[in-house]
């Protein structure tokens, strides 16, 4: 397994540890004190592996079908688990998370149908923008510092817009997948 794929797997493996840190109560409150900052550190490190795996894979021609498939899946695991934890902590509206996760199911469905035909659909430019904004938004929501409340809300709306734009982009670019159904 090459280095970019190892980084992708490392990101996926970090998810259960991250979720545990998000939900461990400290003095009766989840995601506070050392747990909050450790969860944020784990999330940032995991998010940085997303940046690194792609850069390394492109620079050294280490792009694989495994990476094309698993990289977006590891992103989904990390971001969706974080969003679900944030709903539990009442830091993000549930409807926003439902829209984001619904988009992930739609795109995953398109990828699975395409994979059945031997086609691997890599992440799009809009999908990458969406992931970056979602990860930044999640980081601010984990930190939960009142001074960033307005910025966090702006990031949420941008991430939501990019979620919908990227979904439409994937559907339009892969309309041929639907024609085979």
Feature locations, PLM:
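Alpha-helical transmembrane bundles and membrane-interface segments of multipass inner-membrane proteins
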Residues: 1-181
